[in-house]
Amino acid sequence: MELVLNSTTIGVGVVSLILLLYLFLRGGSWKSGEEGPPTVAGAWPIIGHLPLLLGSKTPHKTLGDLADKYGPIFSIKIGAKNAVVVSNWEMAKECYTTNDIAVSSLPDLISANLLCYNRSMIVVAPYGPYWRQLRKILMSEFLSPSRVEQLHHVRVSEVQSSITELFRDWRSNKNVQSGFATVELKQWFSLLVFNMILRMVCGKRYFSASTSDDEKANRCVKAVDEFVRLAATFTVGDAIPYLRWFDFGGYENDMRETGKELDEIIGEWLDEHRQKRKMGENVQDLMSVLLSLLEGKTIEGMNVDIVIKSFVLTVIQAGTEASITTLIWATSLILNNPSVLEKLKAELDIQVGKERYICESDLSKLTYLQAVVKETLRLYPPAPLSRPREFEEDCTIGGYTVKKGTRLITNLSKIHTDHNVWSNPLEFKPERFLTTDKDIDMKGQHFQLLPFGGGRRICPGINLGLQTVRLTLASFLHSFEILNPSTEPLDMTEVFRATNTKATPLEILIKPRLSPSCYESI
């Protein structure tokens, strides 16, 4: 749930909404005799609590403050829509176990239709036979442990290539006295992960030191960036359907244009793969596997090209954003906590040494690094508010009646920093996952820690995402000394967009830890 409104949009919207006050219908209210969750005071006519959520704080912080006042479950109004916000693990467990089927569908949002092939993508498809078939195919053909292992050479080669290029950049730009060079890691992590996912999905490698200005590469990245931005953008029509005709901010038009652009790009890849199949080329990326499996078939009446394009776009979007965001936060936290960095280097030197490059098989031995990634996801989950779901029937949560049609928002950030569960919850302490909290996992079985969501619609790419982050972070820290260029801690200001990203660039100092022969032999 992203709330992106510029000042002009808000101004025009509020004036129009007030003029249309008489149209307001108090739909979805709690019926007499049925006690709903506590309702946050101060809702505006028609626009509800939107002004609260558009304040200076990020929405998950604002909702966290409201939980301190109203309790672990409360209701708000987003335009004409009722929503309940749950903020502790007990309530989350009720939602994702007892009531999971009832909340397994998502609201029918404008972006899901205009960007996601009319809700054909698994991340927005309604819960039902079509969604179940998509998930089964995705899990068996791309995200199963055996398939993830089969593609390990792609991950390793992309990380190694990127490390080599970073070493060459260091050699060209290093300071003679200190031996350090300045790098901006947001871009480096982004291009590395983008290359990795594209190779696994469609066999493309768009970025290297020599091709970063390639027209096709830039076209693809621009379109994906726009998709990510628009998919999480708040539109007035979603909150107040009878005002959709106005298209405040022009977002719907942007969505149509971006959807068309991505459809053309992925369509070109699909045509290339069909040509390769005709020529007898044996390619084992996701697109080729899907063509072999689905060519000439339909899924619940859906055209095969739409299904394949939906799969590809889902994996690119979900596989890049969360991993990049986690890598940025992890590196920032490590630099702001020097003792953690020293422990990581010691573990890497003991388990891997400095005479060879890191392998995926080393990762299972890097227990402190695993704890660092886990603690990063606790403090900075990629989506601190869960993707909104919608109750398809009346339910009871925490003893309160929640009516059909109400939206569910889980404040993962608040759950992850609950002082009733975690000691010193706002501190970065990876050691907690090696001692008191070592048995808590991140895969939906322990509701105290849900960085990938919970229930039937938990993120299916957990294993691939964790493997990508661990390998990239371990390889980077193993290969380079890193240093904060300032005596002040790195700025940790958050920006709430598609993922909860770092507001400022991540500029740091690096120099090699290994001998030059190690980098050149990669």
Swiss-Prot record:
InterPro entries: Cyt_P450, Cyt_P450_CS, Cyt_P450_E_grp-I, Cyt_P450_sf, Plant_Cytochrome_P450_Monoox. Transmembrane segments: none annotated. Its main location: membrane. Its cofactor is heme. Induction: By fungal elicitor. The keyword Metal-binding applies. It is found in: Membrane. Keywords: Heme, Iron, Membrane, Metal-binding, Monooxygenase, Oxidoreductase. It is an enzyme of class 1 (oxidoreductase). Belongs to the cytochrome P450 family. This is Cytochrome P450 82A2.
